[in-house]
Amino acid sequence: MRTKKLPALRVGVGGPVGSGKTTLLEMLCKAMRERYDLVAITNDIYTKEDQRLLTLSGALPAERIMGVETGGCPHTAIREDASINLEAVDRMLARFPDADVVFIESGGDNLAATFSPELSDLTIYVIDVAGGEKIPRKGGPGITKSDLLIINKTDLAPYVGASLDVMASDARKMRGDRPFVMCNLKEQAGLDAVVRFIEQQGMLAAPAAG
């Protein structure tokens, strides 16, 4: 836990359907819950399926996970009109005022989806190798402007004819100095780097002694 109470860090997680957003949330919660006070908000259009899956995984106690039904285009609820998610954040922080981190998972969307700065302090965008080697060079705000890009499911590269070297090279070209991580989240490969990024960029890590 942070020794000095700061406002909860809000981490937005976006990406296309099936890229691994819910898996990332599960792994992050399990990796960080012993050190930090965590809550999570999931977005789906017509159901609360991601909330159910995250709860069943045991990532956090059920009361610390809230599902939001956006009822429309997923990116609208995190960007143009984020009021439904801002209200969800307020409700969770009223329930858990000592929370260190609020994870906000968007509904699956296209490469143009981004989080409103009012809603998210840090943004993580997840794509997956199965979507094709060309995905990083297609660009879009999620790929070029997110604070951290995750290229997930690296284990599938041989099966879909994708070159991880090409994907990494294209990610560097599209993102400049912005970081990215190659991951196989099912096996937790690359997870430590994501946790370190959140701790360092979100100023969660305890300062060094002395």
From Swiss-Prot:
It is found in: Cytoplasm. GO terms for biological process: urea catabolic process. GTP binds at G15, P16, V17, G18, S19, G20, K21, T22. Keywords: Chaperone, Cytoplasm, GTP-binding, Nickel insertion, Nucleotide-binding. GO terms for molecular function: GTP binding; GTPase activity; nickel cation binding. InterPro entries: CobW/HypB/UreG_nucleotide-bd (IPR003495), P-loop_NTPase (IPR027417), UreG (IPR004400). GO terms for cellular component: cytoplasm. Its main location: cytoplasm. It holds the Pfam family cobW. Transmembrane segments: none annotated. It comes from the Bacteria. Facilitates the functional incorporation of the urease nickel metallocenter. This process requires GTP hydrolysis, probably effectuated by UreG. Belongs to the SIMIBI class G3E GTPase family. UreG subfamily. HAMAP family: UreG. Homodimer. UreD, UreF and UreG form a complex that acts as a GTP-hydrolysis-dependent molecular chaperone, activating the urease apoprotein by helping to assemble the nickel containing metallocenter of UreC. The UreE protein probably delivers the nickel. This is Urease accessory protein UreG. It comes from Ralstonia nicotianae (strain ATCC BAA-1114 / GMI1000). The gene is ureG.
